[in-house]
């Protein structure tokens, strides 16, 4: 499967869309994902990492409330990307429920976060 096909596969997952921003793939999350969708998404991300795409951004600016599955899968993605010396940046709005959750759980201290105002 080539990079364009994998990008279309990711876009077919409920609630997300992908963009190429500079040298990173940005995935915009709009709603929590069911576990089945996460399996499709993780497989696609893994394939793209194997193709050498190791810089990622997860845009959470439109996500109101992530579920526990989302949080666990985000941490899984971080570890997979770091294994290939890549980087995953989480983009969120200051004061949003996602930002507050990341502060409360202290994920903000261990993950790479970019805050939009």
Language-model-derived ranges and their functions:
Residues 3-43:
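STAS-typified acidic loop motif
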Residues 25, 58, 117:
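A short acidic, often aromatic-flanked loop/helix-cap motif at beta-alpha or helix-coil junctions
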Residues 109-117:
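Short acidic-hydrophobic, aromatic-tinged amphipathic segments that line or gate anion-handling sites
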